[in-house]
Amino acid sequence: MASHKVSLACTVCGSRNYTVTLSKDRTERLSVSKFCQHCGKHTLHQQTK
């Protein structure tokens, strides 16, 4: 199974704080609640292109 790295960006400030490895079979974007160091709180992070 092939995989690739993608970035997760904060929906509030737009900073790209995290990178994750996903399989190429995944069609929908990943949305996860994570801690943003710039905002100082937990916010929703979404997969960027």
Curated annotation (Swiss-Prot):
Originating species: Leuconostoc mesenteroides subsp. mesenteroides (strain ATCC 8293 / DSM 20343 / BCRC 11652 / CCM 1803 / JCM 6124 / NCDO 523 / NBRC 100496 / NCIMB 8023 / NCTC 12954 / NRRL B-1118 / 37Y)
Gene Ontology molecular function terms on file: structural constituent of ribosome
Any single biological process term in GO: translation
Name of protein: Large ribosomal subunit protein bL33A
Signal peptide, first to last residue: none
Keywords: Ribonucleoprotein, Ribosomal protein
Gene Ontology cellular component annotations, sorted alphabetically: cytoplasm; ribonucleoprotein complex; ribosome
Highest taxon, organism lineage: Bacteria
Protein's gene: rpmG1
Gene3D superfamilies linked to this entry: Ribosomal protein L33
One matching Pfam family: Ribosomal_L33
Family from the record: Belongs to the bacterial ribosomal protein bL33 family.
